[in-house]
Amino acid sequence: MAAVLSSEVKQALQDIYYNVRTGRGREAFALLEKASAAGDGDASCVLARCLCGYQYVWGGHDFPEDDARATKLLHKSVEQGSALGVLVALRSGELTPSVQKKMPFGSLQEAFDQVEALAKEGDAFCQYVIGNSYFWWDFLRIQNKGKDSFPSQAEFKAYLKEEISKCEDWFWKAFRGGVHFAANNLNRYYTQGDEDIIAPQPEKAKDLWKIGAELGYPSHQFIYASELKKQERYQEALHWFMESAAAPNSDCWYEIGFMYWNGKGVEVDKAYAVSCYEKELALTPHNTGSHNGLGQAYFLGEGVPQDYAKAFYHLSYAYEKRGSEWGVFYLAKCCFYGLGTPQDYGKALQFLNKVDWQNKEADYMRGVIYAQGLGGVSADIPKGVAYLQKAGSFTKAKEELLHYKKTLFGKWVRRN
């Protein structure tokens, strides 16, 4: 690792971590690949993190996940002389004795000191790495210390408390400097503490997501907006969902669409809600809520021309691909009446069996299926009539009941 980060690594950190809204994540990824191939160990280290998924890099970059390649890159970064790579490999459990032997440093402390120097100069990624070294107790291996290094358990515990607590300041520096992930560890530090060494301080965690939202982090804007939505502070929630969506950040357009569809914090605009659901699916094709929302819109013909085939497609996708039972009533109607899909009473009954709330039309459909023995079920007129009666004032149920009568012996039969 050089005394300073290369211009390539600095630029990549800006576009990948510190200012994700530049939209240059892919270019930064390619820049790191080129620098890594040219021998830049820090580039290899950051590139490895980019391949480790949304827990380590903003999901909006849509980088590929490749744990095997990430591991190779971490090992490579150590061999290339990156002190940053040494600490990240240590944190990742990849600094095996054989890998450690390949680093050009006399000790882990020497590598730590190099990264700490860059952290003190203001680099947020290095600040985050240093914070993690304290937070996850990596300092024990770095300093080559353990409980046997102290004359008593009390002194060892005091040492642990002093070292662990150093993470707080480093995480705050990283958080304010552009690494939104630092807030995750701050939240854990404040809400859970650390064993019986660091006491929880939950009051310090309550504004973390608000601060992150105000700092412009899309992920925190979404989290904060979700909290506001739960508190029914809908106008504020809508503002932050819109801010996050502009990044762009996944799931936000669904939330915005939901609020416009239901008039939460804004006047109802179902056409705009539909456009929001469509924007969400363009970003995240598997978004369950947007499939359900579009399915409902197409079924009802609200905000969009009625189209049962599209309704059935979207609702079926959410049900079959995502395991969502939200739209089972609509799916049952499609199958029962043959709307947008061939009529299939058997499938209709499967969906109706999942309608576990009071619904008169659902009871009507169940009643018809059982009374007439449709969809492969044996005719059971008494059961069917019971459902039809349960449907109460539903007009079709009242009409269907006219086809049945009770005999003198109290048995329900179909009228001739």
Predicted regions and their residues:
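TPR/TPR-like (Sel1-like) alpha-helical repeat modules
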Residues: T71-V78, D356, A379-K396
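Hydrophobic face of amphipathic alpha-helices that form TPR/SEL1-like repeat modules
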Residues: D15, V46-W58, V88-S98, N132-R141, ...
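Short helix-capping/linker turns of helical repeat alpha-solenoids
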Residues: A38-G41, Y54, G59-G60, Q80-A83, ...
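Alpha-helical segment of the N-proximal tetratricopeptide repeat
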Residues: S7-E27, S226
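Terminal, low-structured helical/coil segments at or just beyond the last alpha-helical repeat
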Residues: G392-N416
